[in-house]
């Protein structure tokens, strides 16, 4: 059995922009089918993924507000990054992978505003 774990956000009750800390777990049911689906998704959306992975520029100043180059490295596909997806691609991704039950998703959502200073002060306990 394969279980993949990823986190998003920060455990901190003094950063109003970080409202939640999320831990996601993906339990793979059929790894071969999932690998094939992943490759199919990437190949059928290659040009769109490449376009989404470019630097995002401020419309007035032209400064880079969000760096690209996270899904593609040295001109080759590396990995999917949900942070690079727009709403349309996120919807397409969910629709595509929910067709066949190749994995299950579990998550833990921690509301940072409910954490106490006492809890956050003890980092060993907080992060373990």
Positions of the model-derived regions?
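Phosphate-ester processing/binding pockets and catalytic centers
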Residues: 1-128
């Amino acid at each position: 059995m394969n279980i993949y774990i990823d986190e998003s956000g920060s455990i901190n009750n003094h950063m109003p922009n970080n409202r939640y800390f999320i831990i996601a777990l993906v339990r793979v049911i059929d790894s071969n089918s999932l690998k094939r689906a992943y490759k199919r998704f990437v190949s059928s959306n290659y040009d769109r993924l490449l376009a989404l992975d470019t630097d995002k520029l401020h419309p007035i100043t032209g400064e880079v507000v969000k760096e690209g180059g996270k899904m593609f490295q040295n001109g080759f596909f590396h990995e999917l990054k949900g942070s690079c997806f727009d709403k349309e691609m996120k919807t397409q991704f969910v629709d595509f992978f929910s067709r066949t039950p190749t994995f299950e998703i579990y998550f833990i959502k921690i509301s940072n505003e409910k954490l106490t200073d006492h809890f956050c002060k003890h980092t060993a306990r907080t992060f373990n």
